UniProtKB/Swiss-Prot annotation:
It is found in: Cytoplasm. This is Chaperonin GroEL. Forms a cylinder of 14 subunits composed of two heptameric rings stacked back-to-back. Interacts with the co-chaperonin GroES. Gene3D superfamilies: GroEL, GroEL-like equatorial domain, TCP-1-like chaperonin intermediate domain. It comes from the Bacteria. InterPro entries: Chaperonin_Cpn60_CS (IPR018370), Cpn60/GroEL (IPR001844), Cpn60/GroEL/TCP-1 (IPR002423), GroEL-like_apical_dom_sf (IPR027409), GROEL-like_equatorial_sf (IPR027413), TCP-1-like_intermed_sf (IPR027410). The gene is groEL. The keyword Cytoplasm applies.
Length: 548
């Protein structure tokens, strides 16, 4: 085992604080409407330019092992805030730096670190309660657009496109962000249920120009097995032919004789039909087939529940107003299922989301809810260069997370004002002893750090602005973009409550751990030449003989 280097007490804390400050100083220049950019060198390709706090934090690795430990702990704050709310990473970093700096000064002055931490925790719990009271519901398109705009560094086009996407697919709809091909941002909305399975044969195509299959008012046959024998499908085909309506077959697979016969029937115009594979695999496929059944008002023909394909009647089939099938996707528009059944299914999947432990499962379940409840919107980010595209895509994703958080827990006045108001409401909070009171005051002072940093980045005098805002009430604050004071909610400067709350909680949690650190242990650096011993030359290789 390699030898270790150990530092204790003040020596350890000073080194750790240096690391915290290096990382936080690099991240905090991005805060606010006039925050600066940070350029990140990449081992290949063009450098990345970003104003995203967590992207900057992830790039930083310090040479000094003790300093690096401090930096990595603050990096954890940014990552946790990003995971919880998708935004607020820079605010969390600024808060953590402020708490650590103030807290370590108190420790150096002889305060008990454990009581300091308890005081900080008390202040944060009380401040979070105040934030919840200050929170205002965010349920109109204008407020959603404002939240998106603020999170995307005052880019109103991003805020507006996210608000439009949410309006079209609903709060539960899936909104994804992709790199577009044009210079402008584009919004592509898929209404109805779409899944990534295309037609099984190009001979089903009936719209030659678009290269797609389009079925008006089709019946939908859902089968939980492979079909290769056409005899199994005959009853359904005959019933649909009599009704003079098209048929969509969604099965695990349709192959061989069954597929060939369907193609021939379709080409001769005997019955308009198309077949696609069911989405997903294994248990997820069964669940998604059931989703489609509920959406279209049909039932899944499965031998597991004693239903046979040969005995299918028209009432077992689902129905929709329209189905569009391309090479890659199938979209079912306006399924004829009962609204109460669909809502029941959505509630059931939501419960599964709450119980799910893995992020992957949650994401897949969320997609299923969206497909049943709303639809899917794709925001295609447009830019002139690849560097700009990456930077903008990061901002759009941040803004999307922020708007989701705003819809979930509401909004508070932005620009660091909410933290100032929360702090002013708990200024009389008392701890169990004087050292806890110092911890409370450390947290209250730290809650001023975001507004000070926003003001500093805008080139204004931070103390003057902080005092003016503290003297005001409610959502009165400072708009760093224009240099004006006023009502932040009316000016459209909003932060999601969840983002502000998460930033404060994670910053205090990690900062508390750092304040109570008494020893640090790291590997001693390897001395050069400590690897393989010198081989002392290879000696002569001798003659190579008669090798050709």
């Amino acid at each position: 085992m390699a030898a270790k280097d150990v530092k204790f007490g003040n020596d350890a804390r000073v080194k750790m604080l240096e690391g915290v400050n290096v990382l936080a100083d690099a991240v905090k220049v991005t805060l606010g409407p006039k925050g600066r950019n940070v350029v990140l060198d990449k081992s290949f390709g063009a450098p990345t330019i970003t104003k995203d706090g967590v992207s900057v934090a992830r790039e930083i690795e310090l040479e000094d092992k003790f300093q690096n430990m401090g930096a990595q702990m603050v990096k954890e704050v940014a990552s946790k805030a990003n995971d919880a709310a998708g935004d607020g990473t820079t605010t969390a970093t600024v808060l953590a730096q402020a708490i650590v700096n103030e807290g370590l000064k108190a420790v150096a002055a002889g305060m008990n670190p454990m009581d300091l931490k308890r005081g900080i925790d008390k202040a944060v719990i009380a401040a979070v309660e105040q934030l919840k009271e200050l929170s205002v519901e965010c349920n109109d398109t204008k407020a959603i657009a404002q939240v998106g705009t603020i999170s995307a560094n005052s880019d109103s086009s991003v805020g507006n496109i996210i608000a439009e996407a949410m309006e079209k697919v609903g709060r539960d709809g899936v909104i994804t962000v992709e790199e577009g091909q044009a210079l402008q941002d584009e919004l592509d909305v898929v209404e109805g249920m779409q899944f990534d399975r295309g037609y099984l044969s190009p001979y089903f195509i009936n719209n030659q120009e678009a290269g797609s299959v389009e079925l008006e008012n089709p019946f939908i046959l859902l089968i939980d097995k492979k079909v290769s024998n056409i005899r199994e499908l005959l009853p359904a085909l005959e019933a649909v032919a009599k009704a003079s309506r098209p048929l969509l077959i969604i099965a695990e697979d349709v192959e061989g004789e069954a597929l060939a016969t369907l193609v021939v029937n379709n080409m001769r115009g005997i019955v308009k039909v198309a077949a696609v594979k069911a989405p997903g695999f294994g248990d997820r496929r069964k669940a998604m087939l059931q989703d489609i059944a509920i959406l279209t008002g049909g039932i899944v023909i499965s031998e597991e529940v004693g239903l046979e394909l040969e005995k299918v009647a028209l009432e077992d089939l689902g129905q929709a107003k329209r189905v569009a099938i391309t090479k890659e996707n199938t979209t079912i528009i306006d399924g004829m299922g009962e609204e109460a059944m669909i809502q029941g299914r959505v509630a059931q999947i939501r419960q599964q989301i709450e119980d799910a432990t893995s992020d992957y499962d949650k994401e897949k379940l969320q997609e299923r809810v969206a497909k049943l409840a709303g639809g899917v919107a794709v925001i295609k980010v447009g830019a002139a260069t690849e560097v700009e595209m990456k930077e903008k895509k990061d901002r759009v994703e941040d803004a999307l997370h922020a708007t989701r958080a705003a819809v979930e827990e509401g909004v508070v006045a932005g620009g660091g004002v909410a933290l100032i108001r929360a702090a002013s409401k708990i200024v009389d909070l008392e701890g169990d002893n004087e050292e806890q009171n110092v911890g409370i005051r450390v947290a209250l002072r730290a809650m001023e750090a975001p507004i000070r940093q926003i003001t500093k980045n805008a080139g204004d005098e931070e103390s003057v602005v902080a005092n003016n805002v503290k003297a005001g009430e409610g959502s009165y604050g400072y708009n760093a973009a224009t240099g004006e004071y006023g009502d932040m909610l009316e000016m459209g400067i909003l932060d999601p409550t969840k983002v502000t709350r998460s930033a404060l909680q994670f910053a205090a949690s990690v900062a508390g751990l750092m304040i109570t650190t008494e020893a640090m242990v790291t590997d001693l650096p390897q001395k050069d030449g400590a690897g393989m011993p010198d081989m002392g030359g290879m000696g002569g290789m001798g003659g190579m003989g008669g090798m050709m």
